[in-house]
Amino acid sequence: MKTLIVVDMQNDFITGALGSKDAEAIVPGVVELVKGFDGKIIFTRDTHTPNYLATQEGRKLPVEHCIKDTHGWQICDELKPYAKNCIDKITFGSVDLPSMIDDGTDEVILCGLCTDICVISNAMILKAHYPELKITIDAACCAGVTRESHKIALDAMRAVQIEIKE
């Protein structure tokens, strides 16, 4: 059994406050991956409160984004019909994510945004929690803050035996 984790495919990371052309470019591929996936699908949502700028993350990245219940926080329209199983997370990685992996899962595939922040954080949490589980990153369905940071994150994950599907 496989599980697909779609990381932070939210409006603010695609066309909003922290959006990019690279993020926009992966949307069709992520839609195709989700539509054709035979297994459990989990979406993560970066979720902040109106006091975001007063948090440690907000002080270091002073751009309001993914404020709960705003348009920017929502999963993009193209993926919204498939986002039935969502987990909200207050930071880059979700410590609750490992508990959502069912017994009998033999592979977890991750895609989404941003490769160098939330994708790598969640992949590393899963790798630490399940060292024998095959964890795969679908690199074509990920985008980083920059293309260079995307590549660096993929290299870092490869170094800890996370599979990278180019």
Residue map of PLM features:
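Residues at the starts of beta-strands that form the adenosine-phosphate
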Residues: 1-3, 39-40, 106-107, 132-135
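Active-site acidic carboxylates
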Residues: 1-87, 145, 151-158, 163-164
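Active-site beta-loop-alpha junctions enriched in small/polar residues
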Residues: 46, 92, 140-142
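Internal catalytic-core helix/loop-beta-alpha segment
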Residues: 69-117
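Short, conserved acidic/polar surface loops in the N-terminal third of protein domains
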Residues: 52-56, 97-99, 121
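A short glycine-rich beta-strand->turn/loop micro-motif centered on a GG-aromatic cluster
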Residues: 109-113, 133-147, 165
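Histidine-anchored nucleotide/phosphate-binding helix
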Residues: 30-36, 120-130
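Conserved strand-to-helix beginnings and helix N-cap segments that scaffold or border functional pockets
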Residues: 120-123, 147-151
